[in-house]
Amino acid sequence: MKTYSAKPAEISKKWILIDATNLVLGRLAAKVAVVLRGKDKPTYTPHMDCGNNVIIINAEQVKLTGDKSNAKNGKFYYRHSGFPGGIKVTTAGKILQSNYPERIIQLAVKRMLPSNKLGRKQFSNLYVYKGQTHPHAAQTPVLYDFAGKNSKNIRNQNIV
């Protein structure tokens, strides 16, 4: 039996819509990374972009487990200005309450993808939006019920 390698003409991309309301961030990001890479398809080829396009709505309503949104001992995000002593620290709770809560999902997914040209191309197929509306209605995205797959995927408490 020969190893299968998909050709560019054989790759078909679908549009998937995920509602992030009350979903656990890490579990959502792990599943989205698998879909973006195309590892959920039988025609997966490691060196080609064969994943689907993913649209995530209601990014501000994603949940964190445990005490990760706490400012004292929670989850921290670091960035550096490039100047000596220029490290900046923010918490996950502050990011979710800011004007751009979709960044927390983008960072989680980006860090689960490979850090090379293909990973950057696959990350460009992710679209995250703050509210219920999105401009991709013409692509007719298929709603993916991520919350119904496992009871651990959803969090009902107001943790943040």
From Swiss-Prot:
One Gene Ontology CC term in the entry = cytosolic large ribosomal subunit
PROSITE patterns, alphabetically?
RIBOSOMAL_L13 (PS00783)
Question: SUPFAM superfamilies this protein is in?
Answer: Ribosomal protein L13
Q: Which GO terms describe its biological process?
A: negative regulation of translation; translation
Signal peptide extent: none
Q: Which InterPro entries match?
A: Ribosomal_uL13 (IPR005822), Ribosomal_uL13_bac-type (IPR005823), Ribosomal_uL13_CS (IPR023563), Ribosomal_uL13_sf (IPR036899)
**Pfam families recorded:** Ribosomal_L13
What's in the keyword line of the UniProt record? Ribonucleoprotein, Ribosomal protein
Say what the protein does: This protein is one of the early assembly proteins of the 50S ribosomal subunit, although it is not seen to bind rRNA by itself. It is important during the early stages of 50S assembly.
Question: Which protein family is it in?
Answer: Belongs to the universal ribosomal protein uL13 family.
Record protein name field:
Large ribosomal subunit protein uL13
Organism, scientific name: Orientia tsutsugamushi (strain Ikeda) (Rickettsia tsutsugamushi)
